């Protein structure tokens, strides 16, 4: 496998994930060792835990001392978190996935404590730690999938062979771009990328794009200088922003009203929905009824057409 150039999102989330897995794992191991060394819990002041444990199933067998709770703590929150950390150090996808899973596991563990013990600061803190670990793991997973997404324009040699067709696209993260190139390669069509004049990349770009999406605004785009009237057929590829058409494509359609002969639409999104409303909006903006409309669920570069 080629060396991956991991993005900032992955690197930051990986650092956070490593912190939480090592911190929680080390705390669990130390707690388990303390229970093994002193099963009564009196030396470390943990004997107060045993009365609450009597509410649990098989308490008369498993919870008469701290040996079994120590084993459970080690196997549920100790060793697994160190395993996740090891995968993170090696930049494996499993590291991010396990971090999220073990954050949720910690939340379940603390939920049991909420049931058998009075509300206390330590349990509440560790529940928050579990939430933080889950979030760090998920963001790390997203960053990993984005960083390992593969796209190369050279893989589509037939693009541009037929000057009567054009594929137009806008893409923040290259997911829509890849699909646009696949379609252009199949049609041998020329291809045109829409470039926004507003910030759309990175964290800030995500939220800024969301603002345009929420208000259903158009977003200023560079003048492509292409005469659409010379093409017999055009395919427009757009991601979905906040359950609607992306702002740069909305602006493009406004500008090209009356200039398109035959048009097809391709949408990409994260949902199991077709988003037919976006196709109707493009029809209204362009002043033409579309020839075809396809909708693809795209989750980190994995595409599924929604029929």
Where do the language-model regions lie?
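Topology signature of small-to-medium multi-pass alpha-helical membrane proteins
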Residues: 2-159, 254-255, 276
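Active-site-proximal alpha-helix that buttresses catalytic centers in soluble enzyme cores
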Residues: 4, 12, 131, 135-307
């Amino acid at each position: 496998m080629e060396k991956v150039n991991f993005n900032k999102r992955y690197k930051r989330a990986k650092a956070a994930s490593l912190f939480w897995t090592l911190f929680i794992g080390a705390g669990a191991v130390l707690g388990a060792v303390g229970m093994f060394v002193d099963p009564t819990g009196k030396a470390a002041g943990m004997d107060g835990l045993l009365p609450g444990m009597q509410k649990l199933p098989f308490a008369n067998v498993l919870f008469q001392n701290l040996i079994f709770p120590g084993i459970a703590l080690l196997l549920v929150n100790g060793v697994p978190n160190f395993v996740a950390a090891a995968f993170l150090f090696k930049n494996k996808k499993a590291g991010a996935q396990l971090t999220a899973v073990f954050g949720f596991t910690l939340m379940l563990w603390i939920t049991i404590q909420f049931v058998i013990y009075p509300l206390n600061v330590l349990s509440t803190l560790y529940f928050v730690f579990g939430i933080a670990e889950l979030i760090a793991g998920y963001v790390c997973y997203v960053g990993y999938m984005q960083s390992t997404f593969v796209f190369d324009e050279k893989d589509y040699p037939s693009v541009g062979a037929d000057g009567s067709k054009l594929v137009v696209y806008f893409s923040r993260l290259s997911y829509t771009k890849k699909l646009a190139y696949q379609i252009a390669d199949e049609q041998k069509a020329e291809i045109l990328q829409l470039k926004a004049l507003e910030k759309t990349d990175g964290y800030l770009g995500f939220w800024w794009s969301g603002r345009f999406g929420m208000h259903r605004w158009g977003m200023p785009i560079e003048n492509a200088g292409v005469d659409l009237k010379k093409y017999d057929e055009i395919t427009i590829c757009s991601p979905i922003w906040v359950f609607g058409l992306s702002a740069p494509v909305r602006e493009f359609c406004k500008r090209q009203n009356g200039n398109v002969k035959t048009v097809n639409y391709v949408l990409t999104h994260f949902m199991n929905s077709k988003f037919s409303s976006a196709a109707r909006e493009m029809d209204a903006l362009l002043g033409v009824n579309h020839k075809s409309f396809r909708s693809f669920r795209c989750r980190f570069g994995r595409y599924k057409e929604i029929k």
